[in-house]
């Protein structure tokens, strides 16, 4: 008979119903409504309709004919009074059997099972058969009796097709009910009597949620092993979850790690059986969560995969590491932070959060901070997690430690960091590090930095401080164990201030510099200034290239497409083919890796500019000033020798002698002139000594800074920045593979 689809109210699924079921439903509705004179109503509808054709054809005609079948059923039922008694008997027998099969009944046997043979085909309103009811209520002895004694009434074909209204097979029902004994019985029957094709078809049947039996196998290790090779591991339910995904996210099982490992191995074997490699992307759900996102422990089984994007975001923008940090999965954090493919500071697009923003526990911060140290410029220190407590800003600092643990994470007030930078600046006034810039930026920190734009500035500042203190530790300007706690920093600052105050001032014993020494210093500084200026220009070009490389690549792609279109229109095939061989570098570099390299280049450029400015001041201000005063000093000496050729040296103002009155007057004028020249020569000599001493000290410190800078520059650009850029770029590009 034809089947029709019943339209249900909003919120309910449509249900397909055949004609036999529809008539039974109609009979039930008539009985419940206690409708009288049913035949009269039918006669009226058939003969007194405004349009007689409407009662014979179409939907209304189908409804009238169904009502006629119901009336005939009642007439036939009334004629044969034995049917009522038979129906009542069957009803009582069914009720008795269901009472024995109910979960409230402690008995697990039916002694007179043969008396119920004629009602073993019963199904309830959920579509459950007698077998399904036995399974659901854990009546396994009765189930075995029925299957063994009435094998002809329940052939394997019927067992394979036995489903409830929601599409649950007997095996699904047994797993859902936790009846593992019944499940093993059914599996044994299937394995013994079914072909592989039938097994695959049965095990991968889905219910109304598109779930197969494998989606419910979250604790049943033995069953998983017995049917695992027949499971379609790529089959997704209505939430987009594969069986493997469902097992991975079932956290309440006692043998979670073993279950996960077994399921993964079986799935891997299934892929190989189908001549393919395990594809990680097959197991992403409708929310963008991957297997890495949901795995609670034992992630090394996934990290061994080559085609694995460990930085993949779900639709909320969360990476697997962010999920682990949020839910404090320490073993996963420990494993994933050791993987070189990890991009630690990947940002959640909607909130601009990094994994550090989800960390609420010190042990978690320490774990991810250790990876930050390893990724830092020289692998010595890492600033992260700026927090506000009342009006004070604090930051977590993870650094290399000499203690029992290789790394230590401490919370330090930003004002303490600011004071530390000031102390270092006083000890190293010619440092190439732009410490004054960082001191000013720390002064401007406030709670408004919690906005998205503010977070960008804070992140940039923390990166700069990380680079700065990495260089200071690399050059041994500060002790390695300085950041064990805030008290250590304050103590070191006090000791350092005390030592600085005890040092004698260079102004007390100024050094006399000779022109030859100044010439040597000038030549040395000019050579270094030229080299630094050349390198600074190269850094400037590199910075601009990094900023515009992707934009220029896009422009080039657009221009190439235009040329390609023109080439297609050329009649000459040789000329046309010339437009097809251009290879571009479009999308060769990820924005994330370019941004990281750009940050390091900017830092190196800032350091270069800072050092260049110090050299420039000495080379183009201090030394020319010394030569100017030296020329004046020589001119004064020349004037003195010319005016007083017989004087060995200029007299002091205290020298006196007896003179005649007129001769004394002339001599007095002469002595006054000599004394003026002597004072000028003395002042010029003092100025030369001060300038010379200043240049000498500056030269010594600049020479040391230039040496430190060269060492830092090579390590920063070659060994760290470029290697980190390549590593990050490869990690990001793997996402697109």
UniProtKB/Swiss-Prot annotation:
Gene3D superfamilies: Ankyrin repeat-containing domain, VPS9 domain
Highest taxon of the lineage: Eukaryota
Alphabetical list of InterPro entries matching this protein: Ankyrin_rpt-contain_sf, UPF0507/Ank_repeat_27, VPS9, VPS9_dom_sf
Cross-referenced SUPFAM superfamilies: Pseudo ankyrin repeat-like, VPS9 domain
Protein name in the entry: UPF0507 protein YML002W
High-level lineage: Eukaryota, Fungi, Dikarya, Ascomycota, Saccharomycotina
Domain VPS9 per the UniProt entry, residue ranges: 1-83
UniProt record similarity statement: Belongs to the UPF0507 family.
Membrane-spanning parts: none
SS bonds (residue pairs): none
